[in-house]
Amino acid sequence: MRLDRLTNKFQLALADAQSLALGHDNQFIEPLHLMSALLNQEGGSVSPLLTSAGINAGQLRTDINQALNRLPQVEGTGGDVQPSQDLVRVLNLCDKLAQKRGDNFISSELFVLAALESRGTLADILKATGATTANITQAIEQMRGGESVNDQGAEDQRQALKKYTIDLTERAEQGKLDPVIGRDEEIRRTIQVLQRRTKNNPVLIGEPGVGKTAIVEGLAQRIINGEVPEGLKGRRVLALDMGALVAGAKYRGEFEERLKGVLNDLAKQEGNVILFIDELHTMVGAGKADGAMDAGNMLKPALARGELHCVGATTLDEYRQYIEKDAALERRFQKVFVAEPSVQDTIAILRGVKERFELLHHVQITDPAIVAAATLSHRYIADRQLPDKAIDLIDEAASSIRMQIDSKPEELDRLDRRIIQLKLEQQALMKESDEASKKRLDMLNEELSDKERQYSELEEEWKAEKASLSGTQTIKAELEQAKIAIEQARRVGDLARMSELQYGKIPELEKQLEAATQLEGKTMRLLRNKVTDAEIAEVLARWTGIPVSRMMESEREKLLRMEQELHHRVIGQNEAVDAVSNAIRRSRAGLADPNRPIGSFLFLGPTGVGKTELCKALANFMFDSDEAMVRIDMSEFMEKHSVSRLVGAPPGYVGYEEGGYLTEAVRRRPYSVILLDEVEKAHPDVFNILLQVLDDGRLTDGQGRTVDFRNTVVIMTSNLGSDLIQERFGELDYAHMKELVLGVVSHNFRPEFINRIDEVVVFHPLGEQHIASIAQIQLKRLYKRLEERGYEIHISDEALKLLSENGYDPVYGARPLKRAIQQQIENPLAQQILSGELVPGKVIRLEVNEDRIVAVQ
């Protein structure tokens, strides 16, 4: 018999049988060796064949191994083993059986039939385990589905459904799928489409994270619970595993061969299987190379004939990009749109999946946490969908609580570090012999014993609390298993088991859980095991940088004295500081309009009066850093074409992928201060873009993504009307001054732009009394720089007065003061430090000498 007529799997098994014979020191390769190799072959046909025939493959393996151990062993064969006469006879019989069936190649399942028909040890073992020619022949027919073996790789295509799909109905029976809450309309629509005669293939389309895959899992659960029409009862839902289908397909045509195997197996099932293809768009173009047919085209005939019941799932963008372009594929699917659930529906979904997260993380998730996860994620996470983003919040909050439970509590950790510190000191003092050291050692020993006692008591308490928590989790896990068991009993109609669980085990476990929970509530001091709305807010703040947690007392006080904080840096300008402070307080108190930015202001005034400085002070107050603001110099946007830099270039232009300067900055940091400096210098088209930001708190970038501006403070500065402010300052009160300036502003900006700004703030010119305070603020920065180099500096009142007089200019504001400090203080100081006149460690005094500021030590 020619060995090249064996299929690939059979040839591999023969090589394995040779190795097995060598390993057992047998002189010949017996049928037993080959049968053992076939049984243990990964992805082989023999093991599933025997299972299909109702034979215990495990028992057969044991019997064959015992028979192998009884075979005669020969030492010094030198690695040369030959097939025995028995094996040659069985292989020839395989050839005969293959020819009878019209096969071009000999497949491994025929070896079992041939072994039964020939006499020998293997035939006796097979018959003892219940194998007969009749049941093996029937199992072979069932496996082949009326097909012949026409190529060497035929066996690789078998069991394709088992290799390349995941059985969702089986997972639902085992209770491994999360419960699906709501989505009744979408599941009903999917069932309606599946019940059609032709084109019975629904495709679920929706944004990422709305629960498309969950709908199919819900369908699988309904099928096993019998909550579907007669036409769908008993069906299996199989999810196609594209990763397994593509992985390892090295040669041209191998992928197509595997997919063809899946489609053939599905055809054999005669409509009893619903195939679920997640990320359906991956099928279009999969396996395509140099004009080869892709997976999408291979599916079309089966879909059109109704042989394949398929449910697809893909996102809106990918459906448009891949499926709609292929009209022939699109018409074979029926669209089922899956919308994002409302906040109320999301709360119901979260309540349904809550128990799974509690079991995994061993924590308790409170109802306020669930409500907070749904409402806060809906408001603050704009670029993702419910319920996915809310589930992620719950998951991460539970994970952080679990991490705290597993790690040592802070109180214990602090005591532990203190004990180590005291022990080190004790070791050092034991080497000393003087009286003071001995006295200190006695005191130290006393403190050490006290700390160790405290530590052991706390450790006991911590261990008891951990044990209490793990006890609760064990009961919860048992209760979950009991609920799965009652469902399984209900499906098979085992009433005795149902009553035993429903009226015996489950009430008992619930009673135990209630008792354990009460005990847990009383004793918990070191460990937190509850996820509350505060934890959800913490996680959200970490994700987005938006402070949504309840305000601590310190933050309340800080917000109430916000004006004083800002006045440390911005001198005068009370109206501007009040306007900004009130906007921030409204936002943190939850009174601001949720669909607009926190505040939008137009700062008007002469140069150098503190417009930009107030923005920096606000960023510092909110984020502890001057850099935490998006600063855009509008003088860069004077040309019409430069507007696209703010939101990103349109498709087809260079830089399209990079995104916009303004939109990208806000996407990365949604809670920020946006400063549009010198806004009147920008092109008028820029203001058209800003209208959406100021009114609705959103902006669409060049790639079509909506960017959320609702948590930003938008501040625009301008010099418009500054000449009026300079001229009439002192003559008019603030209200009249503002009215005059607004008249100038209305000539430069459109009414719809001014109308959308929360407040237009007019800055006063600075007086001499303000300049002295500003001089002190600027000198403090100089003192800080000198302190780092070891110099201490003081300025006399006369020197400060002279500096203020020299630095005051009503037209240019505070900027000339900076130049005065540079020329009159910094330049002479630099020379004296470099020449060695001023040395570190001694106080430098700045005094007036002949109308000049001099530094002396």
Curated annotation (Swiss-Prot):
One of its GO terms (molecular function) is ATP hydrolysis activity. GO terms for cellular component: cytoplasm. The modification N6-acetyllysine is found at K96, K176, K640. Gene3D superfamilies: 1.10.8.60, Clp, N-terminal domain (1.10.1780.10), P-loop containing nucleotide triphosphate hydrolases (3.40.50.300). ATP 1 binds at G206, E207, P208, G209, V210, G211, K212, T213. Residues 341-545 are annotated as: Linker. Keywords: Acetylation, ATP-binding, Chaperone, Coiled coil, Cytoplasm, Nucleotide-binding, Repeat, Stress response. It is found in: Cytoplasm. Residues 3-146 form the Clp R domain. It comes from the Bacteria. Residues 6-71 are annotated as: Repeat 1. ATP 2 binds at G605, P606, T607, G608, V609, G610, K611, T612. One of its GO terms (biological process) is protein refolding. InterPro entries: AAA+_ATPase, ATPase_AAA_core, Chaperonin_ClpB, Clp_ATPase_C, Clp_N_dom_sf, Clp_R_dom, ClpA/B, ClpA/B_CS1. PROSITE patterns: CLP_R, CLPAB_1, CLPAB_2. Part of a stress-induced multi-chaperone system, it is involved in the recovery of the cell from heat-induced damage, in cooperation with DnaK, DnaJ and GrpE. Acts before DnaK, in the processing of protein aggregates. Protein binding stimulates the ATPase activity; ATP hydrolysis unfolds the denatured protein aggregates, which probably helps expose new hydrophobic binding sites on the surface of ClpB-bound aggregates, contributing to the solubilization and refolding of denatured protein aggregates by DnaK. This is Chaperone protein ClpB. The gene is clpB.
